[in-house]
């Protein structure tokens, strides 16, 4: 490793093909068959088109060889390509910008990165119109599936590593409150639903997953009832509070039209609130690091406003 030097052109196609060739020699069902690609993604020799790269990655994914990517560098970093080929390779993508981030990905999270415990994980959430007028999923824009693809085991979806959790956040407009969409001309079935046996359900959650990539999917179903409802964000679980803090910070950075008057300081306050619980484990300091990031963004805001 110490003898490697970065120079000259980058032939990502040949590098991947060589890696797949070597992985094929030891390919074994039930084992970890994964390629770890470290690059800035600036491929200037051979295939550089994202779609063509994904075809190569998908073909080997279907043979049982996964691909994870680590992004390095700044100026020529092809973040989009790195994420896409990792997503389509049943892998993970991480950007390494510091020694601490490298330690987090390659040490603290190594088990989760390489050990997949659930394949092709799909989440489907149906809201009860008796309680919810509007909703939007925050994030996952490039991972959305058509409704009919949920039950199709041939459709590729996300992988879940050992010890990892996935958060899906929805912003909703409760029934009767002002929303972003104009009222419909024709009546809906809200009144009928309000009188049925499911009127205490806010929504219904379905999860599909495969124990192994080759297995048939298993279905989990769970009603989300009014018992699960919290009167305010401050009374929510600390992990939920932190997830909302991170999501709102990202929306603020993107200048989302839905963020309204939410400021960086609001994300800081919510993250600090989640850290105030003794049950929260932040041994690696990652959540504290996020708080520092929100504070830095707030400090830089006046400079950005002047530009």
Predicted feature residues:
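Long, acidic serine/threonine- and proline-rich intrinsically disordered regions
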Residues: 140-166, 172-307
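Exposed acidic/Ser/Thr-rich ligand/metal-binding surfaces
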Residues: 1-121, 180-195, 281, 286, ...
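Polar, glycine-rich mid-to-C-terminal structural blocks
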Residues: 66, 88-97, 102-165, 169-171
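Flexible glycine-/small-residue-rich
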Residues: 37-39, 71, 125-127, 171-174, ...
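Short, glycine-/Ser/Thr-/acidic-enriched flexible segments
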Residues: 41-43, 74, 100, 130, ...
